[in-house]
């Protein structure tokens, strides 16, 4: 994706959301901003637990919040990591959840506070989601 300015505001919302992350163990805050089909945005943050398996990532928090609000059509997601100098992509669990609720061509933007950013699609971060393709048939 070449037109990064198209996602600047969404990325800024993710970066702002990251300030509210609860990360007392890793000190690695993450924010996500999920654009809905009506143009509104729902944010999420990572929420850690000392039992790391119970931690919830920012991407899933945003998606689960939107679903709890009765929203199910998402057009783009931005993920911001202010505590890293490099972009950090979604974990495997988040890739699975993102692919469950977003189309393969939906934009995914992730980046750091250093200005490094990667722009791709759901299919780019989860290229072998055959289950999604089967469900569409």
Regions inferred by a protein language model and the residue ranges of each:
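Short solvent-exposed loop/turn micro-motifs enriched in small/polar/acidic residues
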Residues: 25-27
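Short, solvent-exposed cationic patches
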Residues: 58-78
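Compact, glycine-rich, soluble single-domain proteins
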Residues: 46-60
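C-terminal binding/interaction regions
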Residues: 2-23, 71-137
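Short beta-strand scaffold segments in enzyme catalytic cores
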Residues: 29-36, 109
């Amino acid at each position: 994706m070449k037109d990064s300015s198209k996602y600047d505001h969404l990325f800024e919302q993710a970066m702002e959301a990251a300030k509210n992350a609860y990360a007392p163990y890793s000190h690695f805050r993450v924010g996500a901003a999920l654009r809905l089909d009506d143009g509104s945005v729902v944010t999420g943050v990572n929420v850690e637990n000392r039992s790391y398996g119970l931690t919830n990532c920012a991407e899933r928090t945003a998606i689960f919040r939107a679903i709890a609000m009765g929203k199910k059509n998402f057009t783009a997601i931005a993920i911001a990591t202010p505590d890293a100098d490099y972009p950090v992509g979604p974990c495997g669990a988040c890739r699975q959840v993102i692919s469950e609720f977003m189309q393969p061509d939906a934009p995914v933007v992730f980046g750091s506070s250093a200005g490094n950013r990667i722009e791709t699609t759901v299919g780019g971060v989860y290229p072998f989601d055959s289950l999604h393709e089967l469900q569409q048939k």
